[in-house]
């Protein structure tokens, strides 16, 4: 496929993941979530666990496409890579500061600022993957991604890395480097879901996406790249499932089995959408998600800030308690709050899309 042509299927699948993240993160009342929209508490897997890793996989594909225009030359691309990586990390830190500040009312107290988070993980993993893309042969990407997963698995295997306890190596490293006060929920869950060690397999996630991006762009024959993507997706899916017997599926730890399984699902989903949307040109049913996927990071950042303000101003509680809960009950009312908030964010995405405004972070 032409790397200069915008892949609508990529926008749509990104949009599905961003919409999923907004729904999962913005329910009417904590604890009243349908199972599909609640993360697994520790080991296990739910649809809610898929949205963030799928977004990271798609970021790997976008990284390949964006670096094509530099012909993967280090000198012209490196400034852009470093700038984008640092910008994502900075935005993540500002978001964490803002959410902490409006909760505490103290805008100058950084003692409990969470240092890692979704945007920080995106920035770090993008930066590492993109720098590797302009410095090493791409044929080494998949072997290197597997090696990183093996290294992380060894850490977990010999460091009590599968248990939800204080002596889990993943949590020990997070606490030692970040400090408990700067971890998710001040370290009360022992590990940070976007912590230090678990960034290793997260890099693998983006690298596998990069490899799939290479397949989509470099192979010109539609049947061939679809077959390759299907085979890779199926292999990763079954590998993740089989590995889960020795290495449990765990989003909070970003376990190797979790990486393989979610990459497999993402590859198969993208192959299907590429065929339906970009090959067969069946686009009309997907415009809703395109509005979220054309400017995914802008919509995500906006949703986090808007969601935090609605909670701080007590609008969130008022809408749920006085309107949605009496009409729909606890669970469905909580879900409907997320749906209305999703549509609210979709308005921004729709306006940007209609005006052909694409904000790249």
Where are these regions (language model features)?
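Alpha-helical transmembrane segments and their immediate juxtamembrane cytosolic regions
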Residues: 1-361
